[in-house]
């Protein structure tokens, strides 16, 4: 089960809320302070992409963000429900316009530039971006 | 935290001071501002990002769009930014090669290259 789970309507104004929640939970989980800016940016990019995919496909269900605190690591999974034409298809522009593809790819470029451990999957029921960061053990975090 | 925008003219340059967060929600406001300036004949823009707390790829897209617009009129778009966390986003996307980035508004306004 996720440590914290967030579902929000696919609207741009809620992406900021997702960033704030993710950063707060990441801090609590022991993600290094210096990395929190990257967490904030990466989760924002992933949510922005999911919102765009839902809006382009006319999907009314919410975007799902799972914040998972594990031993020595913290993961964020951002899931969308936009179906891709073929399983494993990473280019979501196939059903929508070409205009959004550039921004979508820029978002993914930022995520892969920021996060070492990232996994992008997509299929006929939607896609998911999973990002993982190491955490500092609580004892060290207190010192 | 929302986006704040203010513009002023320095010589033949128009300085756009941006504050707050530029993301998928607020970026359209910045886009509108840049489009309006170009439509009104301001082709040499300096975007002062010192008050920006957050910038994502949507914001980068708007800045690139602004650059394309001013270049169509042989204009320029210069950025002022000293914040490492914002500069990092320009670096990982390769946009430091696209935008002249200055350390002060004075330097950006004086630049002619």
Curated annotation (Swiss-Prot), chain B:
Modification note: Phosphorylated by RsbW on a serine residue.
Spell out the InterPro entries in the cross-references.
Anti-sigma_ant, STAS_dom, STAS_dom_sf
Name the reported effect of residue 57 to A: Abolished phosphorylation
**What keywords does the record list, in alphabetical order?**
Phosphoprotein
The STAS domain covers which part of the protein?
3-112
Phosphoserine is found on 57
**Ranges in coiled-coil conformation:** none
Q: Which Pfam families match?
A: STAS
Paired cysteines (S-S): none
Q: Name one GO molecular function term.
A: identical protein binding
User: Which family does the record claim for this protein?
Assistant: Belongs to the anti-sigma-factor antagonist family.
Q: What does this protein do?
A: Positive regulator of sigma-B activity. Non-phosphorylated RsbV binds to RsbW, preventing its association with sigma-B. When phosphorylated, releases RsbW, which is then free to complex with and inactivate sigma-B.
PANTHER family given for it? ANTI-SIGMA FACTOR ANTAGONIST TM_1081-RELATED, ANTI-SIGMA FACTOR ANTAGONIST TM_1081-RELATED-RELATED
Q: What is this protein called?
A: Anti-sigma-B factor antagonist
């Amino acid at each position: 089960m996720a440590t914290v789970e967030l579902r929000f309507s696919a609207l741009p104004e809620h992406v900021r809320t997702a960033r704030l929640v993710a950063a707060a939970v990441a801090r609590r989980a022991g993600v290094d302070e210096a990395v929190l800016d990257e967490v904030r940016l990466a989760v924002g990019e992933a949510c922005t992409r999911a919102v765009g995919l839902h809006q382009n496909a006319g999907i009314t269900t919410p975007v799902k963000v799972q914040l998972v605190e594990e031993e020595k690591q913290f993961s964020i999974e951002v899931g969308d429900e936009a179906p891709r034409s073929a399983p494993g298809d990473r280019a979501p522009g196939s059903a929508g316009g070409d205009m959004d593809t550039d921004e979508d790819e820029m978002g993914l470029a930022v995520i892969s530039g920021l996060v070492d451990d990232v996994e992008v999957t997509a299929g006929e029921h939607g896609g998911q971006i999973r990002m993982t960061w190491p955490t500092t053990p609580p004892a060290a975090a207190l010192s | 935290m929302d986006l704040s925008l203010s513009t002023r003219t320095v010589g033949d340059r128009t300085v756009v001071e941006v504050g707050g967060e530029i993301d998928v929600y607020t970026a359209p406001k910045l886009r509108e501002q840049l489009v309006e300036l170009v439509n009104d004949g301001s082709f040499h823009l300096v975007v002062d990002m010192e008050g920006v707390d957050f910038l994502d790829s949507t914001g980068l897209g708007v800045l690139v769009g602004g650059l394309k617009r001013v270049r169509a009129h042989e204009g320029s778009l210069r950025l002022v930014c000293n914040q490492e966390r914002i500069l990092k986003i320009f670096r990982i996307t390769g946009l430091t090669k696209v935008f002249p980035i200055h350390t002060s508004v004075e330097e950006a306004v004086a630049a002619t290259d």
